[in-house]
Every structure is written in structure tokens, then in C-alpha cells.
């Protein structure tokens, strides 16, 4: 109550001074004398920020005691809200009695103002910058225009604001409007106490003033002018967080073109139309400007929140990626650490094997046996990497061994490929799956013809169309060439024969298989020669059904020919008939080449009156293979399959002299076989 009396005395003193017309002009109180207290409460909530501008400019303009009685009307000008102005003209006692809470706030605001002069070092600098903006002129001229034009729309705008920001301000009184922000003001008043406690010159009343100022600032968005000035002034204070200051300065510059109240309303409308995120930012700025130095800390917090959320969203995505990479690196690191010794030791083994190959074949088997348990000790991940290393080392060693062997074979022509003198023959048939003719030529595959000098040379899996044949194979001196490979075919077969055949037939009479090129039949005087490349069942037996269809067609075809003449079948049959015909029969029962279906079809074929010449001569020989996968250095370890055969009619078996497997001949994953006949 004593504060109310002080206000009355100050109001009486001001009534005699010429400062009274300004609040009358700003308030337009003559028209609103009959209005209710509720309308008076609504309007002040809107004009609060402008009153602050006037007070700040007045305090910065004059620090003498004469300004202090003017500060009371400016506090009343904070009552631009039309409360104190109406009280001066319409009856001081009654109006003061109604807004008791406001009168206390006004006194609280009027009392600490002389104390503000103590820390003027910090506060006066930004206020001095605000002086060039004619604050009293704006109060006298622009506010009445803005209010006269926008008193009712401001209520609508305030309602719109309250819907998005503080819904309690439009419907409630000054106390109700102050209550919801009190909770927020308490949260933000704590840093003000901490920051303002450092100079030690400001009392509790000033803290209350800051709280009330913060409350009012939250209730309105007209603080854009003060925000602009504060944003321009803040870079000086924002030396601690320079990054946030730069962002604030940019945002302040964006708001600069609206210094007037009308511009403020436009900016507020634009902000209301903008999404709530953008509207939330100016709110926090208004709070920051009222709290003074707290803006330094509060702005980075409020502004950092959206950035932090974005950073979290962005961080959450790369962070797990990094963790996954780290975890994958850890897992891969373990594998790599385990794989590195394997890769380092294995090429060492491969290097040892390469010279061993040149020396003895028996040592290769011993080294392979020694290497097996070492690999068995390693983990499966390391084993998965072994084939790649072994392929490279194997390919290198095979090339070296190939050159060495070709040189030795050239020198050992008769010794390596000739039969003993006691075995007489007059026909030599050689068969080889070259796994690509052009690659085979680059690996000096044609040397076999010079070394072996076969009478008939059968090739499978040439993978080369007739119009794409290299010149080296189009014309071999002394041979009649017969090719079958359709364009785009992946199979392809060919026959080179020194003896002119009576008739040559291409294919099996089925488009499904003849389009690829799988069989050529050459009729000679005393037999039929069939050069065949049987379809592979494929991984996971995807081609097993076509393979079964082929088997039926082939059996019918061979049976028809065998009724006319003896038949000699050479080529890649893509099956290991018996467990002795492959290194690991138990592990391959469900793999292509050793399925029960394929083996049964081979048994059926032999049951039609045909004989496997190799098993006829060497029924118990083990380790006799014609195919080795490129993986796991299988050929060096002789982990292979016998897939290439020479089958003859039973009546032609007595004419078979020898069946040789030329495992020393490189250039393909298969090796050639040579059959000697004495017809």
C-alpha cells in the first residue's frame, strides 16, 4: 500500500508537469473512460514492450533525478496499456485500487531504476545505441496510430498468438497471463541471479523486475524493435560463444527492416503464418532481451535445441554406421588378423610348392598333407579367404610350372608321351576340355598337338562361335577341322581329324541342346566317334532336370548308332561315376557331378553295352583325376574329379591299347586324356 501512495504522489506531481499529454495521446483515454476493467487489462498486455522502449530510452537519455519522476509516467507508460494513463485523468484512487497487482509491479519497476545506474557500464552501452531511435516520438506518434488502427485486430492477433504460444493471455487478466509464464520465468530467472550476482550491485527487487519484464515479454511479440537493438548489441556481449553470436546477428539482420510498430505487426503476422518452429525462436529472443545478459546463455540453448535435434537425427544415423563400421572392423579385424598370417604363410607354402613341383610330385602330396591340418586349425572365415589366395598363388605356380613343363615336354617329347615299345597302336585319339578356346591358346594349349600328335583331336567347351575363331585354330596343318558353336553359345565342341570322316553330324537332334553346341558325330570306316560335352547340373542342381532330359536323348541316340557300328564316345561327361573317381566323395553327394541321379544315368549308359576304358585298364587306381577346381590350390594338392571319359562299345574293347591322363598338361581346369587303339 505505501507503494500505491507513492504512485499517487508521483501522479500528482506529473499532473502539473507537461509530460501528461503524452500518456493521454498514447492512451486515447477519453474514448475509453466507460470501458470495463477487462478491456483495460487486454490492451496493456499488448503495449508492454513499447513502454519498455520508452523507459530504456529515458533512462539512457538522462540519469538525473528529474528523469525519475518522468520514469513514473513511463512506468505508467508501461501502463501504455492504458491503465496508469487512465488513472491520471479518470480518477487516481479508483483505478489504482483495481490493478493492485499492476501497481505493485509498476512500483517495483520504478524503484529499481535508480539502482540501474550502478551497473550502467554494461546496461548503458546497448541503451545508448537505442537513443538514436526516437523512442518518445514513436510513443507519441506511431503507437496511437497503431493502437487506433489495430486495437481490435490486435486482440484478434493476440488471440492468434495465444493459440500458438500462450493461450491464457487473451482470456485471463494480468495475473492469469502472468501465472503460466511464471513457471518458465523461474527457470530462466535462475541464470539471471547467477549472472547478475557476479557484479554484486543489483538487489532482489531488480531480479523481480527482470522476472516481470520477462513475463511481459513472453506475453507479446511487439518486442521486435528491442530484439533488433538487442541483436545488434549482443555481438559485443556474445564474445564467449562466437558461433551462436554469428547466427543471432544473421537472424537479427533478417528482422531489421521492421523498426516501426506497423512493421512489427506485419512481422508478427508473418511469424504467425510461419510454422511454429519459426515462431518459437522470436519468443525466446524476446525473453532473452528482457533478461539482459541471460540472452548470451539462453539464446544458444534455445537456438541450439533445433540444431541439437537435427544433429542428433543426423548423428544417430552416422553414429550407428560408425559403430557398425567399428564393430565390423573389429570383426573383420579378427578375421583379417587371422587371415593375414594365413595369406602370409600360404603364399610361402605356395612358393615352396612351386619349386617342389619342378622337383618331385611326391613332395607335392606330402606338402599338401602337411598343409591340410594347418588349414583345418584355422577358422571358417579364414578358410573362406584361402581360395582367393590359393587361386592367385596357384595360377602363378601353374604358369611357372607350365613353362617349365612345356620346355621339359619339348625336350622329353618321346619319353613323356610315347608308349612303351611293346605296345603297338595305329590310332591315337586325344580329348580335352579347354574351358575357353582363346584363353587356352594364350596358355600355349596348341603345344599338345606338337607333343601328342594325335590322329583325332576332340575339344569341348570352346566358347567361341565359328565366325570368331582365332587364326591359329582355323587351319591346323594336316587336320580337317569341324566346329560346332552357335553365336552366344557357352559350350561348343570341335574335332580336328587327320583322317577324313565319311560323314559329320552336328548336334543331337534337339533344339534345346543343339543351339548351344554340345555334340559332333563323325562317321569313320570302322566306328562312330562322338565328341560330347554333357550339360552340367549346376550349383544347387538348378540344371538337373535338363541334364536328365539330355541323358535320355543321348542314350537313345547312342543306342541307335551302336546298332550300326561300334561307337567311341570321348568328352566331358560331367560325372564321377564311382567314389574312386573323386577325392572327397562323402562331401559331394549333393553336388553336381556326383549326385545319385547323375551316377545312375552313367550306369544306365554303360548298361547299354559300353565300357569305361580307363577303369577297364586300371580298375583300382586312385588319384586319377581330369578336373581340379581353381579354388584352394586343388590341382597342386590333387583334389580333383575324373569327369573326362572315353567309352567304347563292348565289341571294340579289345582294340583299346592304352588310356593316359596327361595331368602335366596345363592351360585349363581339365587335363587332356589320350586313348591308343590298334584297329
Swiss-Prot record:
Residues 45-55 have a biased composition (Basic residues). Residues 1-407 are annotated as: Disordered. Mg(2+) 1 binds at residues 461, 669. The keyword Magnesium applies. GO terms for cellular component: nucleus. Residues 106-116, 179-189, 203-214, 312-347 have a biased composition (Basic and acidic residues). The record marks 670 as: Interaction with DNA substrate. Its EC number is 3.1.11.2. Mg(2+) 2 binds at residues 572, 574. It comes from the Eukaryota. One of its GO terms (molecular function) is DNA polymerase binding. One of its GO terms (biological process) is base-excision repair. Probably binds two magnesium or manganese ions per subunit. Plays a role in the cellular response to oxidative stress by promoting DNA repair mechanisms such as base excision repair and possibly homologous recombination repair. Functions as an apurinic/apyrimidinic (AP) endodeoxyribonuclease in the DNA base excision repair (BER) pathway of DNA lesions induced by oxidative and alkylating agents. Likely to initiate repair of AP sites in DNA by catalyzing hydrolytic incision of the phosphodiester backbone immediately adjacent to the damage, generating a single-strand break with 5'-deoxyribose phosphate and 3'-hydroxyl ends. This is Recombination repair protein 1. It comes from Drosophila melanogaster.
Amino acid at each position: 500500500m505505501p507503494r500505491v501512495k507513492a504512485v499517487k504522489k508521483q501522479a500528482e506531481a506529473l499532473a502539473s508537469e507537461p509530460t501528461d499529454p503524452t500518456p493521454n495521446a498514447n492512451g486515447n483515454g477519453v474514448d475509453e473512460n466507460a470501458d470495463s476493467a477487462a478491456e483495460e487489462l487486454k490492451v496493456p498486455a499488448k503495449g508492454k514492450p513499447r513502454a519498455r522502449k520508452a523507459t530504456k530510452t529515458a533512462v539512457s537519455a538522462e540519469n538525473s533525478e528529474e528523469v525519475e519522476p518522468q520514469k513514473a509516467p513511463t512506468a505508467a507508460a508501461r501502463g501504455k496499456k492504458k491503465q496508469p494513463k487512465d488513472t491520471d485523468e479518470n480518477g487516481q484512487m479508483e483505478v489504482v485500487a483495481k490493478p493492485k497487482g499492476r501497481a505493485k509491479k509498476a512500483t517495483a519497476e520504478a524503484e529499481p531504476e535508480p539502482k540501474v545506474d550502478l551497473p550502467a557500464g554494461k546496461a548503458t552501452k546497448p541503451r545508448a545505441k537505442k537513443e538514436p531511435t526516437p523512442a518518445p516520438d514513436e510513443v507519441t506518434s506511431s503507437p496511437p496510430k497503431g493502437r487506433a488502427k489495430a486495437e481490435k485486430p490486435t486482440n484478434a492477433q493476440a488471440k492468434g498468438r495465444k493459440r500458438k504460444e500462450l493461450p491464457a493471455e487473451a482470456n485471463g487478466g494480468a495475473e492469469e497471463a502472468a501465472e503460466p509464464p511464471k513457471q518458465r520465468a523461474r527457470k530462466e530467472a535462475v541464470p539471471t541471479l547467477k549472472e547478475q550476482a557476479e557484479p554484486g550491485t543489483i538487489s532482489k527487487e531488480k531480479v523481480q523486475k527482470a522476472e516481470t519484464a520477462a513475463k511481459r515479454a513472453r506475453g507479446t511479440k511487439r518486442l521486435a524493435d528491442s530484439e533488433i537493438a538487442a541483436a545488434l548489441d549482443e555481438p559485443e556481449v556474445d564474445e564467449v560463444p562466437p558461433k551462436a553470436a554469428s547466427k543471432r546477428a544473421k537472424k537479427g539482420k533478417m528482422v531489421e527492416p521492421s523498426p516501426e510498430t506497423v512493421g512489427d505487426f506485419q512481422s508478427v503476422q508473418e511469424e504467425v503464418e510461419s510454422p511454429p518452429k519459426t515462431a518459437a525462436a522470436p519468443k525466446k529472443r524476446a525473453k532473452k532481451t528482457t533478461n539482459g545478459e541471460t540472452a548470451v546463455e539462453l539464446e544458444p540453448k534455445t537456438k541450439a535445441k533445433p540444431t541439437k535435434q537435427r544433429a542428433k537425427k543426423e548423428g544417430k544415423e552416422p553414429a550407428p554406421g560408425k559403430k557398425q563400421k567399428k564393430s565390423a572392423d573389429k570383426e573383420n579385424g579378427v578375421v583379417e588378423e587371422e587371415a593375414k598370417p594365413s595369406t602370409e604363410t600360404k603364399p610361402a607354402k605356395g612358393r615352396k610348392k612351386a619349386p617342389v613341383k619342378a622337383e618331385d610330385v611326391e613332395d607335392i602330396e606330402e606338402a599338401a598333407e602337411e598343409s591340410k591340418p594347418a588349414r583345418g586349425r584355422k577358422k571358417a572365415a579364414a578358410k573362406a579367404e584361402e581360395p582367393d589366395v590359393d587361386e592367385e598363388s596357384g595360377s602363378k605356380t601353374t604358369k611357372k610350372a607350365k613353362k617349365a613343363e612345356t620346355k621339359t615336354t619339348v625336350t622329353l617329347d618321346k619319353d613323356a608321351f610315347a608308349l612303351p615299345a611293346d605296345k603297338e597302336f595305329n590310332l591315337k585319339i586325344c580329348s580335352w576340355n579347354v574351358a575357353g578356346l582363346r584363353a587356352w591358346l594364350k596358355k600355349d594349349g596348341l603345344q599338345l598337338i606338337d607333343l601328342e600328335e594325335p590322329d583325332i583331336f576332340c575339344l569341348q567347351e570352346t566358347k567361341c562361335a565359328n565366325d570368331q575363331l582365332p587364326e591359329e585354330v582355323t587351319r591346323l596343318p594336316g587336320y580337317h577341322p569341324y566346329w560346332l558353336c552357335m553365336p552366344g553359345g557357352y559350350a561348343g565342341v570341335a574335332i580336328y581329324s587327320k583322317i577324313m570322316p565319311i560323314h559329320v553330324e552336328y548336334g543331337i537332334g534337339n533344339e534345346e541342346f543343339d543351339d548351344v553346341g554340345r555334340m559332333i558325330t563323325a562317321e569313320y570306316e570302322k566306328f562312330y566317334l562322338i565328341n560330347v560335352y554333357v550339360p552340367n547340373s549346376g550349383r544347387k542342381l538348378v540344371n538337373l532336370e535338363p541334364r536328365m532330359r539330355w541323358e535320355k536323348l543321348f542314350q537313345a541316340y547312342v543306342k541307335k548308332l551302336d546298332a550300326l557300328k561300334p561307337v567311341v564316345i570321348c568328352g566331358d561327361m560331367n560325372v564321377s561315376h564311382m567314389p574312386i573317381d573323386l577325392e572327397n566323395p562323402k562331401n559331394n553327394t549333393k553336388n553336381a557331378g556326383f549326385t545319385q541321379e547323375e551316377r545312375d544315368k552313367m550306369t544306365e549308359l554303360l548298361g547299354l553295352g559300353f565300357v569305361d576304358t580307363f577303369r577297364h585298364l586300371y580298375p583300382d587306381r586312385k588319384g586319377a583325376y581330369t578336373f581340379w577346381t581353381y579354388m584352394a590350390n586343388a590341382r597342386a594338392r590333387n583334389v580333383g574329379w575324373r569327369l573326362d571319359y572315353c567309352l567304347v562299345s563292348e565289341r571294340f574293347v579289345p582294340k583299346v591299347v592304352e588310356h593316359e591322363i596327361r595331368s602335366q598338361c596345363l592351360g585349363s581346369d581339365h587335363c587332356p586324356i589320350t586313348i591308343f587303339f590298334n584297329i
